[in-house]
Design a protein with these regions (language model features):
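Conserved N-terminal structural module of periplasmic/extracytoplasmic solute-binding proteins
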Residues: 1-92, 100-107, 231, 285, ...
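Short amphipathic alpha-helical coupling segments at ligand-binding clamshell hinges
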Residues: 35, 39, 211-218, 296, ...
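Paired acidic/hydrophobic, glycine-rich loop segments that form the ligand-binding mouth/hinge
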Residues: 77-80, 248-253, 259-260
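Glycine-centered hinge/linker elements that transmit conformational signals in sensory
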Residues: 161-164, 201-232, 276-280
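C-terminal lobe and pocket-closing loops
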Residues: 255-271, 284-395, 433-434
Length: 435
């Protein structure tokens, strides 16, 4: 079992306290406090010689800090990882397998949407902390007043945007951070338009493929329905703009948006009759729209100082009462990874889940109908690509999107330029398989 060798609890007298470093991406104060009061408190009681130091980091900061700590040889003992980074770290032999933990948690109860995301050569190297769907968040009342159905295609979405842009209000706003508009959204466009980042066999980039060109054309047309200064604004700014009526849809949203609606929307409008999720439309070459599934995985490194204790901490993190409390800190956005818990009356009894139940139902139905792929994935097999983290970090895709959307440049010319740069990058990384 994972607990092998954990009998060596240091004697309290005269022995220095050891620190278990845990990094994660849940920055909301109530979540940080709950982790401290549940898993950490129980862990420190169980292992009196240890102090757990948790550090909450935003997505963008996490990737940068992690890569620096790995290069320096002192990563945290336990961390969240973006799923598109995992294959890259696995091929560099930086991750420890966690099969025993997965079996202890209940392999068959972990949702299929996340179970095998970090599964390489017959072993598990990660476990998702929680699942959160992403989508448009819309002012449902405004769309319904126009008598328009939820859009299914790019054309439907452009017509809806034209109808909702009026009287100083814009139809939507995209977040300006490069990770979102330059990686997360292009992955969704490819996935929902029959495309992929690379050719599945040769790994040759597909940035100037028909699927990407159609998506860039759509993005360029969409741009006129959002406020001009959007590239300088962030994800959270778009949620505030939706809640206070400046826009009719936030392009990137999850159930975390509910907190903004309850804080900033006018009283009498803080409900699912006015605000609802809207799944992504599909392109002319696609059959169904795909949205990103937000769910970082826990990882333990080969360089971790206290790997046994890190796994022991995870057992406590997923202990039912601790995990329920964790998921309830951002209801619906932190949906449990366990199928049994998704329908558990104790989980569903949370006040916010009861009030916003239609948002929970969108998530569950989307999971059932395969409408979600992990962040940055254009197809399920992308979890095996060992260069997605580098492609994101290079800014190649982000530059292309900015030139097309903000600069109004020709999509084909920008896609050709990005394609050339991506081919050079993959060649430099030594992963070129095409001739």
């Amino acid at each position: 079992m994972v607990a092998i060798g954990l009998g060596r609890v240091p004697s309290a007298i005269g022995q220095q306290t050891r620190e278990l470093h845990v990094w994660h991406t849940e920055v909301e104060p109530q979540t940080v406090k709950t982790i401290q009061d549940t898993s950490i408190a129980e862990f420190e009681k169980k292992f009196p010689g240890f102090k757990v130091r948790q550090q909450a980091l935003g997505w963008g900061d996490l990737n940068t800090k992690l890569l620096a700590s790995l290069a320096a040889g002192n990563p945290p003992d336990l961390t969240h990882l973006n799923p598109f980074m995992t294959a890259s770290l696995y091929t560099k032999q930086l991750l420890r397998p966690m099969d025993e933990l997965i079996r202890a948690l209940g392999e068959s109860d972990i949702h299929e949407a996340t179970l095998k995301l970090q599964y390489f050569d017959g072993k598990y190297y990660g476990v998702t902390h929680a699942m959160g769907a992403t989508y448009f968040a819309e002012r449902r009342d405004l769309r319904e007043k126009k008598g328009i159905k939820p859009p299914e295609t790019y054309d439907d979405m452009l017509k809806l945007c034209a109808a909702l842009t009026e009287g100083g209000r814009y139809a939507f706003q995209m977040p300006g951070e490069k990770l979102y508009m330059g990686f997360v959204h292009p992955a969704e466009w490819l996935a929902g338009n029959g495309g992929s980042w690379v050719d599945p066999k040769t790994w040759r980039p597909q940035l100037n493929s028909k699927a990407m060109l159609e998506a860039l054309d759509y993005a360029q047309k969409l741009n006129k329905f959002q406020p001009q200064g959007w590239p300088g604004q962030k994800y959270l700014d778009t949620l505030a703009a939706l809640a206070n009526g400046k826009i009719a849809m936030a392009h990137l949203s999850g159930a975390r948006t509910i907190g903004y609606i309850e804080r900033y929307a006018p009283e009498g409008m803080r409900d699912p009759e006015h605000f609802m999720p809207l799944l992504r439309p599909h392109g002319p070459s696609g059959k169904v729209g795909i949205s990103a599934l937000d769910g970082e995985n826990w990882a333990v490194f080969t360089q971790s100082k206290y790997p046994n204790e890190a796994f022991e901490f995870l057992r406590l993190f997923y202990k039912k009462e601790h995990y329920l409390a964790y998921c309830h800190t951002v209801p619906i956005h932190l949906s449990p990874i366990f199928k049994s818990m998704l329908n558990d009356p104790t989980y569903l009894a949370n006040e916010r889940i009861k009030k916003w139940r239609p948002w929970h139902d969108v998530m569950v139905t989307g999971l059932k109908n395969n409408r979600f792929l992990p962040i940055g994935f254009s197809r399920p097999e992308d979890n095996l690509l060992p260069f997605l983290a580098e492609l994101d970090g290079s800014g190649i895709v982000a530059d292309m999107v900015v030139e097309v959307m903000v600069g109004g440049k020709n999509p084909k010319a920008e896609a050709d330029r990005a394609q050339k740069r991506a081919e050079e990058l993959l060649t430099q990384l030594g992963v070129k398989r095409w001739s």
